[in-house]
From Swiss-Prot:
<dbReference type="InterPro" id="IPR013848">
    <property type="entry name" value="Methylthiotransferase_N"/>
</dbReference>
<feature type="binding site">
    <location>
        <position position="67"/>
    </location>
    <ligand>
        <name>[4Fe-4S] cluster 1</name>
    </ligand>
</feature>
<feature type="binding site">
    <location>
        <position position="105"/>
    </location>
    <ligand>
        <name>[4Fe-4S] cluster 1</name>
    </ligand>
</feature>
<protein>
    <recommendedName>
        <fullName>tRNA-2-methylthio-N(6)-dimethylallyladenosine synthase</fullName>
        <ecNumber>2.8.4.3</ecNumber>
    </recommendedName>
</protein>
<dbReference type="InterPro" id="IPR006638">
    <property type="entry name" value="Elp3/MiaA/NifB-like_rSAM"/>
</dbReference>
<feature type="domain" description="Radical SAM core">
    <location>
        <begin position="169"/>
        <end position="403"/>
    </location>
</feature>
<feature type="binding site">
    <location>
        <position position="187"/>
    </location>
    <ligand>
        <name>[4Fe-4S] cluster 2</name>
    </ligand>
</feature>
<comment type="subunit">
    <text>Monomer.</text>
</comment>
<dbReference type="GO" id="GO:0051539">
    <property type="term" value="F:4 iron, 4 sulfur cluster binding"/>
</dbReference>
<comment type="similarity">
    <text>Belongs to the methylthiotransferase family. MiaB subfamily.</text>
</comment>
<dbReference type="GO" id="GO:0046872">
    <property type="term" value="F:metal ion binding"/>
</dbReference>
<feature type="domain" description="TRAM">
    <location>
        <begin position="404"/>
        <end position="466"/>
    </location>
</feature>
<dbReference type="InterPro" id="IPR006463">
    <property type="entry name" value="MiaB_methiolase"/>
</dbReference>
<feature type="binding site">
    <location>
        <position position="190"/>
    </location>
    <ligand>
        <name>[4Fe-4S] cluster 2</name>
    </ligand>
</feature>
<feature type="domain" description="MTTase N-terminal">
    <location>
        <begin position="22"/>
        <end position="142"/>
    </location>
</feature>
<feature type="binding site">
    <location>
        <position position="31"/>
    </location>
    <ligand>
        <name>[4Fe-4S] cluster 1</name>
    </ligand>
</feature>
<keyword id="KW-0819">tRNA processing</keyword>
Amino acid sequence: MTQETALLSTSPEGGDLNVPARKVFVKTYGCQMNVYDSDRMSDALSRDGYVATDVLEDADFVLLNTCHIREKAAEKVYSELGRLRELKKAKALEGREMLIGVAGCVAQAEGDEILRRVPAVDLVIGPQTYHRLPDALKRARAGQRIVETEYAIEDKFVHLPAPDKAKTRARGVTAFLTVQEGCDKFCTFCVVPYTRGSEVSRPVAQIVAEAEKLVEGGVREITLLGQNVNAWHGEGPHGREWSLGDLLRRLGEIDGLARLRYTTSHPRDMDDSLIEAHRSMAKLMPYLHLPVQSGSDRILKAMNRRHTAAEYLALVERIRAAQPDLALSGDFIVGFPGETDQDFEDTLRLVEEVNYAQAFSFKYSTRPGTPGAELKEQVPEDVKAKRLEILQALLVKQQRGFAEACVGREIDLLLEKPGRMPGQLVGRSPWLQPVNVDAKASQIGDIIRVRITKAGPNSLFAEMIGESDARS
């Protein structure tokens, strides 16, 4: 099959099969949920005959799926839109049409302002309405300028296509699956409640059906996603209320699904059922991302976290008692308004006590529209930078220590992709570290037994000691 033939339209709506398919280029910013959303939007467009392209200049439609968490997120998007505007002009001079769309949390936050500032943009669509993207794009092609950012009454997941087996297989043996969206915690630094809305949980049957489709497409590991994933709840058999632990146990029953993970969690929603799942489920990987943000009770209160440092530490102790092999990850913000040297020392003390396998740390940045933006006593930038440097040095030391402690251990490794060297494959350890192994006789998707031989700065190295598992 020639490349031109491969790009012919396959629209189920009966388009001319001799007309080249339109191409869509999607650029994804930010979190894993945006990666999931981008895949689902691409799948939805494929029903109208669009094919994905990695070449920006070839695209008939360019979609930016944006993130609004970090400082100047919107300005970075506007900068990218300026470049796309020039590309759109150049293509128009050649008689080629290119539409531009903005999706995600910047779209939700900015709305009509995007069209005002960048008239070259054709459509703006929020994270709760992207199931309407195919229709919005048709209207944009007819000359309308579209803004779809209201919170939809209908369940968007009902209107999205099920995962396509061929596309799933092409995306790899690991997959994300959104089970929960939004957040009701209203931390004073965070925009999520304003861009993603209140907490909403997908129904059990819907989640299980999507997971089974992913496994049919060759997926062996699924990561459940949510802005506050452990707030998920739903109705189980006989009307019993289920929490995330129950859902994990149900997904663990799917034949062919070897591994489960979930992210991101809030300490206040780690219930007994979920902790028990960590103790009893072999398929649930011993890795937990549990952000705390600060080790100072005073700052935690100002952040509206609604827990203390001692309560967080007690929770960590309970989880580790249930799963002693657990690798813990966290998030930290330094320089929150009013943070003193003592507050920062309290954070360092908590980090020392927990001993993280991995963590993410950032300087506080004002997010317009959040309560934190109105707080006095903003910390000077040079103080933030110095504190971040100190904290990151400690976290890197802990991460290296955890990696070095893995040397000599024997683990099961899920092979995910080719390595840089001939015969080398790369997988993820149970604790989410990349692991390089010489495994010429194995293939992507196999789970093999390896011994860790070396810890590098960003990955581990291993030797194969066991045969690949049988694959159905």
